[in-house]
């Protein structure tokens, strides 16, 4: 299995480990570089890899694709949407929102023990393999090769959980994490609450909080004396509803062309998500800038801040902002699912020594 490309960035850490050890299995611990000192933005000598293998995280349950017979057995309603492809394999029409939602429900039931999952029309329907990849990589980030790290003691904050609640669901079921999930949309949180109530395995493990200020990220959510080992976020991608609609149309067109047909009707936005899930003023770049600025206020309450970054051009401004905040360590993890590349940007105000002490105090077995 090839390793994911992990690039060090202008930060206090010269190199990053490609993969941290899974606390539940034996693995070779990565070498840790000594911090170069807070506040520095020395360019790394690491060279980016020329090629990123088209593979999911080694612990990803979807590494070898979808087992449709098993999924249909677990969730019979999926059978209606499964068709053979021209190449002889089984698949669903990924341009059909109902087909994608039904596939997600089957995946969550078969692989993660979630018996009931649903989202309202218009809500973002997340690709499960890519979402759980993020969860696995930040689990590695948290462990840093420490085999004594008790993952089920970790407290995690999900910023912008949406109506699907996918990161809390996956984090709870894969690693036993305790979650706080926030959103600016009360209707989205109500749907996540309904999912929790219908699945006893999630009850008592996910706390929902409404963000009263749509311009804030952590403020109003993280409470005094509260600690989190990780924060996760999938920021709104677009800067306007018009841009979001165009992105949805383009995505559906590409899917239809891949299937050898053309779009005969306007694509439904429920393929892409609700307004707050899709766009915000200033788009992804502005959202990340706000997140980075606010993270300094909670530097001693969160061990690792992380976020997905979809647009590569947004990385440089993030690095520059982090370099001005006395951040100790910055890491960028590149993930690839098929032809799509996404990145996890992670930063910590704690030194490697302090992170080790944090794990010993809060995550010891």
UniProtKB/Swiss-Prot annotation:
Annotated catalysed reactions: adenosine(1618) in 23S rRNA + S-adenosyl-L-methionine = N(6)-methyladenosine(1618) in 23S rRNA + S-adenosyl-L-homocysteine + H(+)
CDD domains: AdoMet_MTases
Keyword list, A-Z: Cytoplasm, Methyltransferase, rRNA processing, S-adenosyl-L-methionine, Transferase
GO CC terms of this entry: cytoplasm
InterPro entries found in the cross-reference section: METTL16/RlmF (IPR010286), rRNA_lsu_MeTfrase_F (IPR016909), SAM-dependent_MTases_sf (IPR029063)
Region (Disordered): 1-50
Compositional bias annotation for Basic and acidic residues: 33-50
Single biological process term from Gene Ontology: rRNA base methylation
Membrane-spanning intervals of the chain: none
EC main group: transferase
E.C. number(s) listed in UniProt: 2.1.1.181
GO MF annotations, alphabetized: 23S rRNA (adenine(1618)-N(6))-methyltransferase activity
Main location: cytoplasm
Gene3D superfamilies to which the protein is assigned, alphabetical: Vaccinia Virus protein VP39
Pfam families: Methyltransf_10 (PF05971)
Keyword rRNA processing: yes
Subcellular location: Cytoplasm
Record's keyword annotation contains Cytoplasm: yes
Similarity remark: Belongs to the methyltransferase superfamily. METTL16/RlmF family.
PANTHER family named among the record's database cross-references: RNA N6-ADENOSINE-METHYLTRANSFERASE METTL16, SAM-DEPENDENT METHYLTRANSFERASE
Stored HAMAP family: 23SrRNA_methyltr_F
Role, per record: Specifically methylates the adenine in position 1618 of 23S rRNA.
Entry protein name: Ribosomal RNA large subunit methyltransferase F
Organism: Shewanella baltica (strain OS195)
Gene symbol of the encoding locus: rlmF
């Amino acid at each position: 299995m090839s390793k994911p490309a992990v690039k060090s960035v202008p930060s206090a850490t010269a190199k990053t480990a490609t993969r941290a050890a899974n606390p539940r299995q034996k693995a070779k611990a990565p070498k840790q570089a000594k911090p170069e000192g807070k506040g520095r933005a020395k360019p790394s000598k690491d060279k980016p890899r020329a090629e990123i293998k088209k593979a999911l995280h080694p612990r990803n349950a979807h590494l070898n694709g979808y087992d449709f017979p098993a999924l249909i057995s677990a969730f019979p309603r999926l059978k209606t949407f499964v068709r053979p492809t021209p190449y002889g394999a089984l698949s669903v029409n990924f341009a059909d929102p109902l087909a994608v939602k039904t596939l997600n429900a089957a995946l969550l039931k078969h692989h993660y023990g979630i018996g009931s999952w649903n989202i309202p029309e218009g809500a973002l329907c997340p690709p499960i393999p890519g979402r759980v990849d993020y969860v696995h990589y930040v689990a590695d980030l948290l462990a840093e090769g420490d085999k004594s790290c008790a993952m089920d003691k970790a407290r995690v904050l999900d910023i912008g959980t949406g109506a699907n609640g996918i990161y809390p669901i996956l984090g709870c079921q894969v690693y036993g994490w305790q979650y706080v999930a926030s959103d600016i949309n009360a209707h989205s949180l109500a749907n996540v609450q309904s999912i929790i109530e219908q699945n006893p395995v999630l009850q008592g493990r996910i706390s929902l909080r409404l963000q009263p200020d749509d311009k804030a990220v952590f403020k109003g959510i993280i409470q005094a004396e509260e600690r989190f080992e990780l924060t996760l976020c999938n920021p709104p991608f677009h800067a306007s509803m018009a841009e979001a609609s165009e992105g949805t149309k383009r995505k559906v067109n590409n899917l239809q062309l891949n299937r050898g047909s053309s779009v005969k009707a306007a694509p439904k936005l429920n393929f892409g998500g609700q307004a707050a899930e899709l766009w915000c003023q200033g788009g992804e770049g502005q959202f990340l800038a706000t997140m980075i600025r606010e993270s300094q206020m909670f530097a001693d309450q969160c061990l690792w801040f992380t976020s997905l970054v979809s647009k590569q051009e947004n990385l440089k401004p993030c690095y520059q902002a982090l370099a001005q905040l006395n951040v100790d360590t910055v890491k960028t993890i590149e993930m690839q699912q098929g032809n799509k590349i996404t990145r996890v940007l992670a930063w910590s105000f704690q030194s490697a020594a302090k992170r080790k002490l944090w794990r010993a105090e809060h995550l010891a077995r």
